[in-house]
A protein has these predicted regions:
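Noncatalytic linker/hinge segments flanking ATPase motor cores
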Residues: 54-58, 76-87, 158-168, 212-223, ...
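Soluble or luminal CAZymes and related metallo-dependent hydrolases
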Residues: 20, 100, 104, 147, ...
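Catalytic-face loop-and-helix region of soluble metabolic enzyme cores
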Residues: 232-343
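Alpha/beta catalytic barrel-like cores
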Residues: 1-144, 228, 260, 278, ...
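Short, flexible coil/linker segments at or flanking structured domains
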Residues: 4, 9, 26, 214, ...
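Glycine-rich beta-strand-to-loop/alpha-helix junction loops that act as flexible
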Residues: 124, 178-180, 310-313
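Short amphipathic alpha-helices and their capping/turn segments at secondary-structure boundaries
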Residues: 25, 101-117, 155-171, 249-255, ...
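Active-site loop segments of alpha/beta catalytic cores
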Residues: 121, 140-250, 261-264, 268, ...
Length: 346
């Protein structure tokens, strides 16, 4: 797989609180020149929330009262037939994310000079999408075979379209699927066999062979299950949940052995923590995490050589100034860790 640039490069997770995509994109590119990402801007419009944002041409979908729903079963079949014909054609243009639903993506593509060493995008994952979006009977569409299959294949095409757009900025594209519902796996809320979860995740990953594909989950989950997928990039909340990953040291070691990238979300997303922390305190926290992983038998060089620095999650609910401080903390932490390890990115 493609290697990401430099040592401890930094990038973002997704959302920013800005209303204007121009300043948001400029902030991202200035702070993360090695791996810029397109910022989601949910305060601009409800259409930039994590489910409607990717549903512009989703078969059987409608929005009522600000809520996205989707037809399922026999009711979906006529639209599903049309969709499958379009899917098999290989044409990606019908799956474009319109600028009104992704102003940050449009802004990055039009304003960023590039080329960059790498560039990152994101899409809501099929598990979370399918469990959050319901049909007329208020049943999550993931539990309907027709709805699930259409949804997974639709999101695959959206991801492929996005990756194709981002190659205009870099040969190395990181495409991360956001899966908050993985934190509910095994609970009374979500009763899904693990193999079904992995099957839909891998359908996305297998359809993006030239892309560094990944998963973001900003809470605790069954990391062994997640790492059994074909993900090449794991983004997690290392500020709050780093110790949970220690329980899966063998899985993490195997992930590194196959060239995986671990994105440490070690910069907090709570306003009070952002105000309190500094690059120095976060570097010490990161060193503690590295010590613990090394103590579990994972070579420190493997971790350091594959680490990316990010915020723990999106920053869209924060004041602009606080979110921008979090980005500066990522930038400062990245620089400090490079200095500590005596190397600089090329």
């Amino acid at each position: 797989m493609r290697r990401l640039p430099g040592l401890f490069p930094c990038t973002g997770v997704g959302s920013l609180p800005h209303l204007d995509p121009g300043p948001a994109v400029r902030e991202v590119v200035s702070r993360f020149p090695e791996i810029p990402y397109w910022p989601q801007l949910p305060r601009r419009t409800p259409l930039e929330h994590m489910y409607p944002q990717y549903a512009a041409t989703l078969p059987g979908a409608w929005i009522s009262g600000g809520k996205l729903s989707m037809r399922s079963g026999e009711e979906l079949l006529p639209e599903a037939e049309v969709f499958y014909e379009l899917f098999l054609s290989g044409d990606l243009s019908p799956f474009a994310i319109p600028p009104e639903r992704a102003a940050g993506l449009a802004g990055l593509l039009s304003a960023a000079a590039g080329p960059f060493p790498a560039v990152k995008g994101q899409v809501t994952g099929p598990v979370s999408f399918g469990l959050m979006v319901c049909d007329r009977e208020k049943k999550p569409v993931f539990y309907d075979p027709v709805g699930r299959d259409v949804l997974v294949k639709y999101l695959l095409r959206v991801a492929q379209w996005q990756a194709a757009q981002l190659t205009r900025l870099s040969e190395t594209v990181v495409l991360v699927i956001d899966e908050p519902y993985l934190a509910s796996m095994g609970s009374a809320i979500v009763s899904l066999p693990g193999e079904e979860v992995i099957a839909v995740l891998d359908e996305i990953f297998e359809g993006l062979p030239g892309t560094v594909c990944g998963i973001h989950c900003c809470a605790n989950t069954d990391w062994g299950l997640v790492l059994s997928s074909k993900t090449r990039y794991l983004s997690f909340d290392a500020y709050e949940y780093a110790d949970s990953l220690l329980l899966y040291a063998e899985d993490v070691a195997a992930f590194f052995a196959r060239g995986g990238v671990l994105a440490f979300g070690v910069v907090p997303t709570a306003a009070e923590a952002i105000a309190r922390e500094t690059a120095e305190t976060l570097a010490d926290r990161m060193e503690t995490i590295l010590d613990k992983l090394s103590a579990r038998g994972i070579p420190r060089d493997d971790i350091v050589g594959s680490a990316v620095i990010t915020p723990a999650c999106g920053l869209g609910t924060l004041p602009e100034g606080t979110a921008e401080r979090a980005l500066r903390l990522c930038e400062g932490l990245s620089s400090l860790l490079r200095a500590r390890y005596g190397r600089r990115s090329p």
